């Protein structure tokens, strides 16, 4: 088939008339220098603070320093293939991570990418890692308990849903153990848990994940891991990513618990980034806004009211409050709680659980110092039965510590002092607890009632824990109905108390311990 010249020219003309190009306006810049994961870029005139920047090879960065003629950005990932002269583009987006129930049971990095080898995560939603905390009007007071299963915490420093309770202590004092036990005890409590590991050894994180799997806790837990080998940028961002994942549940009228292990290493990572960006250093070489990085993170842990949840879900969820409870961990050096970061976080949180090296080495584990551990809002959330029976525990320990110091000098002690010392020794022994063995509310109530009513008085202190364990086993097999009632009502009525006392007497009469 031959085409005439006129037909060819008509065809070309029609093609030219219908030709269209879609132009995309994008700000571009050029890499000036790359050092230690920090990139200086020239030419990104419209970049926003905290905006994602795209490098060649599908690598992204975060704009942190906006200067007159250059931009300082931190690279999220490997920077070996980035070199001077590379073209950089603005994305117009803020960093987001995947959120939703699809992440539960998985181990992800600070960007929400799976690192457990179990395949991709098909999350339907993503959310910004930096969000404004709920305002005062949107909040509700803390009134529901978080049962940690640890006697010393639930009786002396109770934690409520929506609270921020700091766990602080030197290295190797059992901080992670307390937090992991609290996660294990949330089984069947309608609580989604997020464990954020910051700057830890990969082997340590793997060990925690294995323990959570062994106790069936990964069924309701998300692990966000930024190990010591990850770039400082990811260690800095991991807590915010974990918090966003927790807020997904909070905002939909559910309860979530998040553990930041630990925020000291996040502050170190931020200090490293800030110094490399040439920001002016302040106290202990931290930048001036190190308080703000922790306050804006921890203020996002809250209990939100029904109206907030209803508005957020467009009326799909009604009459439900949501909560995000935070257990931040801070590592001190030689017990110095007056250092910069510890004092910052103490002032932000609603109380602290202070773990001491001396107590830990003396075999008192969890090594909680009852004198300076406090819960500022958790008292209102404590379960009725523990509040009723555990009131004397803190007092007994405080009196014991005081009297024990004097007893070293006094040779002859009066009867009252001797009784107080004996009771203090007993309570100290009873507050000991094995790792990965959280107790139910009823088991705790049994121990506290037996201690209050003098059932331990004729038991040698060294045998107290064996007596307690045997008593729990006996009651579970013979008097399970009483324990079930305590667990379901979280209270102990007069008749139930008498029945429980009779059951303990039955145990003492018929069992060797």
From Swiss-Prot:
PROSITE patterns named in the record: ATPASE_ALPHA_BETA (PS00152)
InterPro entries: ATP_synth_asu-like_sf (IPR023366), ATP_synth_asu_C (IPR000793), ATP_synth_asu_C_sf (IPR038376), ATP_synth_F1_a_nt-bd_dom (IPR033732), ATP_synth_F1_asu (IPR005294), ATPase_a/bsu_AS (IPR020003), ATPase_F1/V1/A1_a/bsu_N (IPR004100), ATPase_F1/V1/A1_a/bsu_N_sf (IPR036121)
Gene3D superfamilies: 2.40.30.20, ATP synthase alpha/beta chain, C-terminal domain, P-loop containing nucleotide triphosphate hydrolases
This protein's record includes keyword Acetylation: no
Subcellular location(s) per record: Cell inner membrane
GO-annotated molecular function: ADP binding; ATP binding; proton-transporting ATP synthase activity, rotational mechanism
Site (Required for activity): 373
Residues holding ATP: 169-176
Function: Produces ATP from ADP in the presence of a proton gradient across the membrane. The alpha chain is a regulatory subunit.
Protein name according to UniProt: ATP synthase subunit alpha
Source organism (scientific name): Methylobacillus flagellatus (strain ATCC 51484 / DSM 6875 / VKM B-1610 / KT)
Gene: atpA
